[in-house]
């Protein structure tokens, strides 16, 4: 019979039931580097969240500050527009990292939400040459049901590409967990990992 202690869903960092896979080793090798984008893709229940949690732990062990955004937990009211979700993103960064610069100090509707969030990250986090930040986006699939999805992932892609133009952006690592079906929106950036194949 099944062991009642076996866990379902995300497996805790200290769980004796977590089975380490090849993808864990790949993550452990990527995360300490600067300016990496890691895409963890696969259907539900293959260990994406567990792998993301371990990636976050590796980032912390390497002196990076981390922000974990689980899109399942975000209130529906923040998904009314691209501005809504990106402003929420900015407020979470400010709260979790206790930044002295606040979103209201930088946000400019005349520039639009993507540029405002980008400027906020630069001024609040990346201006500090000592700060390295890993942002984890779990269950990013939720974005795909909204009309602003292209704008959201264009913003992520712009941050990825910005590293070639502005060295500050090499202090930002991105880790994105998503299912295989909508991957076209974020294909061709970063290192793609599939826990189901590990």
Where are these regions (language model features)?
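The catalytic "switch" region of P-loop NTPases
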Residues: 142-198
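Conserved helicase/translocase P-loop NTPase motor core
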Residues: 115-127, 155, 176
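Conserved P-loop NTPase "ATPase switch" module shared by AAA+ and STAND
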Residues: 106, 124-152, 159
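Conserved catalytic segments around the Walker B and adjacent sensor/switch elements
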Residues: 60-78, 135
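Walker A/P-loop-proximal flanking segment of P-loop NTPase domains
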Residues: 1-45, 50-59, 119-127
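Short glycine-rich substrate-engagement loop in P-loop NTPases that contacts/grips substrate
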Residues: 77-83, 100-123
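Conserved NTP-binding/hydrolysis module of P-loop NTPases
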Residues: 66, 79-102
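Alpha-helical scaffold elements adjacent to nucleotide-binding pockets in ATP/GTP-utilizing enzyme cores
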Residues: 50-55, 84-92, 151-159, 196
């Amino acid at each position: 019979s099944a062991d009642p202690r076996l866990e379902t869903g995300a497996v805790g960092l200290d769980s004796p039931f977590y089975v380490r896979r090849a993808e864990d080793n790949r993550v452990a090798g990527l995360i300490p580097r600067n300016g990496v984008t890691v895409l963890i893709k696969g259907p539900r229940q293959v260990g994406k969240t567990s792998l993301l949690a371990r990636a976050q732990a590796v980032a912390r062990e390497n002196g990076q500050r981390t922000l974990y955004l689980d899109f399942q937990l975000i209130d529906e009211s923040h998904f009314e527009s691209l501005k809504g979700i990106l402003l929420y993103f900015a407020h979470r960064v400010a709260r979790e990292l206790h930044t002295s610069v606040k979103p209201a100090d930088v946000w400019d509707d005349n520039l639009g939400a993507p540029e405002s969030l980008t400027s906020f990250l630069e001024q609040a986090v990346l201006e500090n040459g000592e700060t390295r930040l890993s942002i984890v986006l779990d269950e990013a699939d939720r974005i795909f049901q909204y009309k602003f999805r292209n704008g959201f992932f264009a913003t992520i892609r712009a941050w990825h590409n910005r590293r070639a133009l502005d060295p500050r952006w090499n202090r930002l690592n991105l880790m994105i967990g998503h299912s295989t079906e909508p991957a076209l929106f974020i294909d061709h950036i970063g290192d793609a990992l599939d826990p189901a194949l590990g």
